[in-house]
Design a protein with these regions (language model features):
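Histidine/acidic-residue-rich, glycine-tolerant segments that coordinate divalent metal ions
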Residues: 78-80, 86-96, 103, 120-179
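Acidic/His- and Gly-rich active-site-bordering loop/insert found
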Residues: 2-97, 106-109, 113-122
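A short, hydrophobic C-terminal helix/tail in secreted or cell-surface proteins
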Residues: 180-184
Length: 184
């Protein structure tokens, strides 16, 4: 089975990850339930991780000799009242995952699970960064100040976007989907 087949095989699990996260959105630097959800899965899959206070998790898979890379997902929600009526709608009044961070976190969790399964095949260390407070630049600054990412040569992020057909990706060498950091 190749990686694509493995990803499709756990698609329903990823949907459940997203829906569970969507039900319990949390604002910047208060992502405690989200972090607990992530931590439980990392422990279940025997993936090592470090928790940063007040919020943020970096998990590690692989130990190869090539340069270390990082994969990043954002965890925070917006202070918006959800009125979708979905059976997995937000249970936190006045707080909602309105721009896909629940999906981003679910995707990174699935990636962690698959990478762990193939850990012996990896030629490098991969950091899985679950970043708080993405809606401002503060979350990125906080994660960088930990020093854990100092050895990372490249960081890859993901952002759900309706303008790209399903099954396709867009790679851009510029700032995208940023609100505060565009002028830095």
């Amino acid at each position: 089975m190749d990686i694509n087949e493995e990803a499709y095989a756990i698609q329903e699990e990823v949907v459940e990850f997203r829906r569970a996260l969507h039900r319990c959105p949390e604002i910047a630097f208060h992502e405690t339930m989200t972090m607990e959800y992530i931590r439980e899965h990392l422990e279940e899959w025997e993936i090592s991780y470090k928790i940063f206070d007040p919020s943020g998790i970096i998990a590690v898979v692989g130990n190869g000799k090539k340069e270390t890379i990082a994969l990043r997902a954002d965890m925070d929600a917006l202070e918006v009242q959800e009125e979708t009526g979905l059976d997995f709608a937000s249970l936190n009044h006045g707080c909602m995952h309105a721009c896909g961070h629940d999906g981003h976190t679910a995707i990174l969790l699935a990636t962690a699970k698959i990478l762990k399964k193939h850990e012996s095949e990896l030629d490098r260390r991969v950091y899985l960064v679950f970043q708080p407070a993405e809606e401002t630049a503060e979350g990125a600054r906080f994660m960088l100040k930990t020093g854990v990412l100092d050895s990372v040569k490249r960081i890859y992020g993901v952002h759900i976007f309706n303008g790209i057909p399903s099954g396709k990706i867009s790679l851009e060498a510029c700032l995208l989907y940023t609100s505060d950091a565009a002028d830095e």
